[in-house]
Design a protein with these regions (language model features):
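Alpha-helical packing segments of well-folded alpha/beta enzyme cores
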Residues: 2, 64-72, 176, 180
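N-terminal carbohydrate-binding/catalytic regions of secreted carbohydrate-active enzymes
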Residues: 2-5, 22
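A short, Lys/Arg-enriched amphipathic alpha-helix followed by its capping loop at the start of a domain
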Residues: 4-11, 183
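C-terminal domain-boundary segment and adjacent tail
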Residues: 17, 21-23, 73, 107-118, ...
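A polyampholytic, Gly/Pro-enriched intrinsically disordered region
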Residues: 129-139, 210-217
Length: 245
């Protein structure tokens, strides 16, 4: 099935779940199976019952997010701070996104395929690269894995290939997922990460402190960060000051 294929290829996924629909739908992964099934992946919110957010006022949106978070967090025993818009972010109204932030969410994914590899300017309006059934997937993969980039890693700009979809859309055609994973897996130059891991990593970069002359960088976080300076890959070790030559 989906997760066994992802695990076989070392891929990482974020699963956006509606806590209010799980108990009444036995075909879904049940709460008691979360730890075993989703181990190594991320659990994120998708609202409590999957309503159209545009049909709700801000209080209704807050309820859907907070209730979903509360139940999911009770199961996974850690903060759930990610989100995917049910039916996508189609018609944003004033304060909708700010409401999500006030509910403790750090990022929210849309369904607008960008066909780009850039990090989002706003993680609460995070457009993915493509859907798993996108007819341009192979061309996008070719563009992402440019041979010259692999031979000259200092030329690489930070890129993110973000694929989204629904498990039901595979309709049992797990050969498609297997082909996608084969195409993307086992690249030494790629970090395979969940949404939350990406947000944490980018947030850690924003926390770096540089000296006026740029020679000294202090990493106050608990994450090792990687940069390229003068064609040299450098690790900014967590909790330490790095001197750049």
């Amino acid at each position: 099935d989906m997760i066994s294929i992802l695990n076989r290829y070392g891929m990482k996924a974020t699963f956006n779940l509606n806590a209010g629909r799980i108990a009444n739908q036995p075909q879904r992964v049940q709460f008691e199976d979360f730890e075993e099934v989703y181990h190594g992946h991320e659990i994120a919110s998708h609202t409590f019952t999957h309503p159209h957010l545009n049909n709700l006022d801000l209080g209704g949106i807050a309820y859907q997010v907070v209730k979903d978070r509360e139940l999911l967090e009770e199961v996974v025993q850690k903060p759930v701070q990610g989100f995917a818009y049910p039916y996508g972010l189609k018609q944003e109204f004033p304060d909708m996104v700010n409401c999500l932030k006030c509910c403790g969410l750090r990022y929210a994914r849309t369904i607008r395929n960008s066909h780009r590899f850039t990090l989002p300017e706003d993680f609460l309006r995070w457009d993915p690269t493509c859907h798993h059934e996108d007819p341009e997937f192979d061309q996008l993969a070719d563009k992402f894995f440019k041979p010259d980039d692999l031979e000259h890693p200092w030329r690489i700009k930070l890129k993110l290939f973000y694929i989204w979809g629904h498990s039901r859309e595979f309709n049992g055609n797990w050969e498609l997922l297997d082909r996608i994973c084969q195409r993307l897996a086992n690249k030494d130059i790629v970090w395979y990460a969940t949404n939350g891991q990406i947000v944490d990593y980018v947030s850690a970069f924003y926390a770096l402190r540089r000296s006026v002359n740029g020679k000294f960088i202090y990493n106050p976080t608990d994450v090792d960060l990687y940069v390229c300076v003068n064609k040299q890959n450098i690790v900014l070790e967590k909790g330490k000051i790095t001197i750049l030559e």
